[in-house]
Amino acid sequence: TLRGFKGGTLWGVAEKLPYLLDLGVEAIYLNPVFASTANHRYHTVDYFQVDPILGGNEALRYLLEVAHAHGVRVILDGVFNHTGRGFFAFQHLMENGEQSPYRDWYHVKGFPLKAYTAHPNYEAWWGNPELPKLKVETPAVREYLLAVAEHWIRFGVDGWRLDVPNEIPDPTFWREFRQRVKGANPEAYIVGEIWEEADPWLQGDMFDAVMNYPLARAVLGFVGGEALDRDLAAQTGLGRIEPLQALAFSHRLEDLFGRYRPEVVRAQMNLLT
């Protein structure tokens, strides 16, 4: 929900599985489920603990069991570019400053940390002080994140949807990520949140697919046509969407299908809205 915690657990998702099966669902992509101080859970506090509000690790394990029993895969959302301020390393850094062994886990510009002001003295996602950016080039940070990725695959999760992976520009990290994930489960699915041209990410050494936002823009332009509130749609991050007639829509689809290798096209996370 946009504001507040309105209920709902992973136990509830498992309970609704018959309904999802009736819809023909074969995979469930969950937004972040790890312990967090935010209702949307992009402010990760503990990467090894499913939020108790959602039922904790036990609820995820049960959901995986019942989903797999019906041939349904479960994909988690991985937020590896930044953490919440409640993450243990950032908490230690706030308490101990330059003496903290975690001082190289973040891009700190000065001490003491100014974590509760509009202008933090550390790098943060889009300048939001609630989301300090991890320093992935630090070996300990890198290994921590790779261990998280591998842990949940071995737990039984079927893949990862990666939040803002382009903001971790070092391609060697994502190559190592793929090696660790595929080493735990060669069939695991890795999809990145890349909004535009994604060819560098789809060469077989990083992601299996990306979120197909260009397709979403085309579908909205065709289905919504002149009735679409394009100003509102632009606020979603999709940009300005122009109406498409059938022939133009067909040409747009042909262009999208031709951008990548056939095996990548078939694996894309296609978004219809």
Q: What function would you assign to each model-found segment?
A:
Residues 33-35, 79-81, 165-167, 193-197, ...:
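Active-site beta-loop-alpha junctions enriched in small/polar residues
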Residues 1-76, 81-92, 127-132, 143:
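N-terminal structural segment of carbohydrate-active enzymes
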Residues 19-23, 66-70, 90-92, 96-99, ...:
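An active-site-proximal structural segment forming one wall of the substrate-binding cleft
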Residues 29-31, 75-79, 163, 191-193, ...:
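A cross-family glycoside hydrolase active-site/sugar-binding cleft signature
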Residues 86, 90-102, 107, 149, ...:
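Conserved alpha/beta catalytic core and glycan-binding cleft of carbohydrate-active enzymes
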Residues 24-26, 68-72, 156-158, 185-189, ...:
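Short, well-ordered coil/turn segments that N-cap beta-strands
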Residues 125, 130-201, 205, 244, ...:
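Active-site neighborhood of glycoside hydrolase catalytic domains
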Residues 92-141:
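Glycan-binding loop/region signatures in secreted carbohydrate-active enzymes
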